[in-house]
């Protein structure tokens, strides 16, 4: 992780301690910090156990209805929520594991990662970002995203 990215991640973590959080801005800051173009934030509806879209960027409008509500275990976000760990693809376009839903390929992104928003082992949602090129996220990047997810969870409880 570069110093620039480290400072940006620190700035994101600091912003998550504010009382009035703009989730769209948080997502845009994360996308920028990790040199990505696309992203989503889903919050877990504790009553229905469904992930509900809270913020998105770079998603084609016709796909929004398909990812507004995601069941646990479906697609990258749903699997990250189910496993409570990061789910990553170097190239979503060529993936044939079944993890990515068919509609996900219509985003035209390649390197992508979804991380759970966890606090003390409890799921609060997911954060997903992607690049338009094949990419493997580093362990430092995964850890930073998980830390951001933890701080997002704390912010939801504040």
Residue ranges: model-predicted function:
Residues 60-63, 90-111, 131:
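Signal-transducing coupling segments at domain and membrane junctions
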Residues 41-64:
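GAF sensory/regulatory domain recognition
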Residues 77, 117-131:
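Sensory-domain boundary capping and coupling elements
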Residues 44, 61-94:
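Regulatory sensory and allosteric helical modules in signal-transduction proteins
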Residues 1-21:
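Signal-transmission linkers at sensory-effector interfaces
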Residues 27-31, 37-45, 78:
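Short, hydrophobic-rich beta-strand element in sensory/regulatory alpha-beta domains
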Residues 2, 130-148, 155-158:
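Regulatory loop-to-helix N-cap segments in sensory/regulatory domains
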Residues 110-118:
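A short, aliphatic-rich beta-strand micro-motif
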């Amino acid at each position: 992780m570069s110093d620039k990215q480290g400072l940006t991640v620190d700035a994101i973590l600091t912003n998550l301690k504010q009382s009035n959080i703009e989730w769209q801005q948080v997502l845009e800051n994360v996308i920028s910090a990790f040199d990505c173009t696309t992203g989503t934030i889903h919050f877990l509806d504790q009553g229905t156990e469904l992930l509900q879209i809270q913020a998105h960027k770079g998603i084609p409008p016709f796909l929004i209805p398909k990812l507004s509500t995601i069941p646990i275990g479906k697609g990258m976000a749903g699997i990250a929520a189910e496993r409570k760990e990061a789910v990553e693809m170097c190239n979503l376009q060529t993936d044939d594991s079944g993890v990515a839903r068919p509609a996900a390929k219509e985003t035209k992104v390649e390197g992508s990662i979804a991380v759970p928003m966890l606090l003390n082992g409890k799921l609060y949602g997911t954060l997903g970002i992607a690049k338009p090129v094949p990419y493997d996220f580093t362990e430092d990047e995964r850890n930073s995203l998980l830390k951001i997810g933890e701080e997002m969870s704390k912010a939801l409880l504040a």
